[in-house]
C-alpha cells in the first residue's frame, strides 16, 4: 500500500518526466529487450532496433498508462481495468515481464534524474510500479 509520502514522491517524480515520458518508456523497453532477451518474443512483428518507431510508439503507450496510473493512484484497479484485461486475456503476457519492465523503468528514471532519485523516491517508485504490476496481473487469476 502506498503511503501519502509515497504518493507525493511518485507524483513529483513522474511530474519531472513530463514531455519525456514517451522517450523514457521507449528507453525502458530497449533496456528490457537488451537485458532480458526473452521479452522480445511478445513483439515478433516489431522492429526492435535502437530508435525504432514501433518501440517508441509502444514506449509512449507504456508511459501514457503509467501517467494514467499516477493520476488515479487511489483507484488504479478501475483506471487500469481495460489494460489488465488486454494483457491477461488477449496478449497473455507472462506476469514476470511486468517486474522486468518495472526494473528497467527504475534504471531509466535514475539515469535521467540522478539528483532526484533519492532512496526514498526509489522506494516509492518501486512500490508504485509493483502496485501497477499487481493490478495488471489481477485478471490472470
Swiss-Prot record:
The modification Phosphothreonine is found at residues 8, 108, 134, 137. O2 binds at residue 58. One of its GO terms (biological process) is hydrogen peroxide catabolic process. It comes from the Eukaryota. Keywords: Acetylation, Heme, Iron, Metal-binding, Oxygen transport, Phosphoprotein, Transport. The modification Phosphoserine is found at residues 3, 35, 49, 102, 124, 131, 138. The modification N6-succinyllysine is found at residues 7, 11, 16, 40. The keyword Phosphoprotein applies. Pfam families: Globin. The keyword Membrane does not apply. Heme b binds at residue 87. Red blood cells. The modification N6-acetyllysine is found at residue 16. Residues 1-141 form the Globin domain. GO terms for molecular function: haptoglobin binding; heme binding; iron ion binding; organic acid binding; oxygen binding; oxygen carrier activity; peroxidase activity. Gene3D superfamilies: Globins. The modification Phosphotyrosine is found at residue 24. InterPro entries: Globin (IPR000971), Globin-like_sf (IPR009050), Globin/Proto (IPR012292), Hemoglobin_a-typ (IPR002338), Hemoglobin_oxygen_transport (IPR050056), Hemoglobin_pi (IPR002339). One of its GO terms (cellular component) is blood microparticle. Belongs to the globin family. Heterotetramer of two alpha chains and two beta chains. PANTHER family: HEMOGLOBIN FAMILY MEMBER, HEMOGLOBIN SUBUNIT ALPHA. Involved in oxygen transport from the lung to the various peripheral tissues. This is Hemoglobin subunit alpha. It comes from Cebus capucinus. The gene is HBA.
Amino acid at each position: 500500500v502506498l503511503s501519502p509520502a509515497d504518493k507525493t514522491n511518485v507524483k513529483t517524480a513522474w511530474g519531472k518526466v513530463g514531455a519525456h515520458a514517451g522517450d523514457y518508456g521507449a528507453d525502458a523497453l530497449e533496456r528490457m529487450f537488451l537485458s532480458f532477451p526473452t521479452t522480445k518474443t511478445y513483439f515478433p512483428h516489431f522492429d526492435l532496433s535502437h530508435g525504432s518507431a514501433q518501440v517508441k510508439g509502444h514506449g509512449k503507450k507504456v508511459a501514457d498508462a503509467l501517467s494514467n496510473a499516477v493520476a488515479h493512484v487511489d483507484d488504479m484497479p478501475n483506471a487500469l481495468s481495460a489494460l489488465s484485461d488486454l494483457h491477461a486475456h488477449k496478449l497473455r503476457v507472462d506476469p514476470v515481464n511486468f517486474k522486468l519492465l518495472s526494473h528497467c523503468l527504475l534504471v531509466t528514471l535514475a539515469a535521467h534524474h540522478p539528483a532526484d532519485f533519492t532512496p526514498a523516491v526509489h522506494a516509492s517508485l518501486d512500490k508504485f510500479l509493483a502496485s501497477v504490476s499487481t493490478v495488471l496481473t489481477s485478471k490472470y487469476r
